[in-house]
Amino acid sequence: MPLSGMAIAFKASTSACTAQQLWGHPTRDQCQYGFTHLNERKSRKGSAALHARAVSGKLDLDFSDPSWKQKYQEDWDRRFSLPHITDVFDLEPRLTTFSLKKNSDASSPDKWNGYVNKDDRALLKVINYASNTSAGAECIDPDCSWVEHWVHRAGPRKEIYYEPEEVKAAIVTCGGLCPGLNDVIRQIVFTLEIYGVKNIVGIQFGYRGFFEKGLKEMPLSRDVVENINLAGGSFLGVSRGGAKTSEIVDSIQARRIDMLFVIGGNGSHAGANAIHEECRKRKLKVSVVAVPKTIDNDILFMDKTFGFDTAVEEAQRAINSAYIEARSAYHGVGLVKLMGRSTGFIAMHASLSSGQIDVCLIPEVSFTLDGEHGVLSHLEHLLETKGFCVVCVAEGAGQDLLQKSNATDASGNVILSDFGVHMQQKIKKHFKDIGVLADVKYIDPTYMVRACRANASDAILCTVLGQNAVHGAFAGFSGITSGICNTHYAFLPITEVITTPKHVNPNSRMWHRCLTSTGQPDFH
């Protein structure tokens, strides 16, 4: 499958998931954590027969069976086991070359080197919901029974499966720009050198660098990448789309690459997994490890992805400008459009953190513009009562109100209609029609929020993710990604991460907090 089609395949696989419901919660965030979904079926006598099917896999659960929890957890453990090169090759591990001891003659406990036991696990879900009516409840059964969800803890292992001096490692950055890309590249190089790897290269301009003539490998070392974190963008360059998976693996094989680090979002992760599978098919001893990158924060199971905090921080600058413009004008309306194709995390968090937003519109929550309970009517009320207002919209919001397009970009993403411009025009027309003066200022900081340098919070996250990606590769894992889950760093199989994108849960406490802050009503 061409990698440019990976995003299409990824999005198509989500439709069935988002159409279902959690028990008693018809939201668009059913798949946020990948737990099983429930269906209630009425029997002929009118009683409810309860069944569940896992989001991934073919597991059917009968909750009247006392062993259903055990079956569920066994299925979870199977799904979240990490692919390893020993699944294909008969290899013996060797002692790691990763050491933080500066004096080779000094003896110290293993814990001083920060080794992680291969059986360490991190708990993914920590809230024990008492009822399926609790805000944000994610329930497997109608009683919201507690079931543990464990994932593999990330970090350096005491045993490795590669000889560092023989390793050739490659790094590629895919998709769009994101604050922190250079921080991740830098830490991957630093950590590889600590292990003893001498041959490190960068693949220029995404997957395109594997096949485009004239794009040569870029030799990387600590000296080369020492200060690249001081600037935004990608030191290696980025691009969307790419060649067929087989052509990329042909290039990997010809270049004798042993480790490939893919920094990218959902589509790039799907591509990385396809590369991993093709390498396995050809019996190539190649570890493919991904690092989740997206300012949209829509990677499943992750607390957050790098670049998100920086994007929210930068978005506040635009919101503050819109606030000042609106506050200073007679009947001023500030309108800000933020990134978020299918998720409203940036818009929600920027609205919360700024405290200046009166209306926040996101893709996960439907709304109407016209009518007594529409957005425009509420804006009328705001101008009458406080004299001005500020509106924040995610780019993917309100697409059902616009003419749909079948056009796609190089990554296979549907090109969205510009709701921000549509909203601006609707506001102007509405107030003109009712004879009220409205001074509308529209701000679109789309590329400003992603082209900047990572802030301190994201820089730390990037540092750890880059280091853990290398630890995962040397531990022999492939087809995995490194992320932060429930405040702990973990390794996850890419196959589970790309099941569906993460969405804002309209029943969650965070969205409720946003509504409390804005004071906006339901727009229906």
Regions found by a protein language model. Give the residues of each.
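Accessory alpha-helical/coil subdomains and C-terminal extensions
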Residues: 251, 262-264, 270-289, 300-438
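Short glycine/threonine-rich loop-to-helix capping motif typified by GTGT followed
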Residues: 403-408, 450-460, 492-500
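Active-site pocket-lining segment
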Residues: 437-452
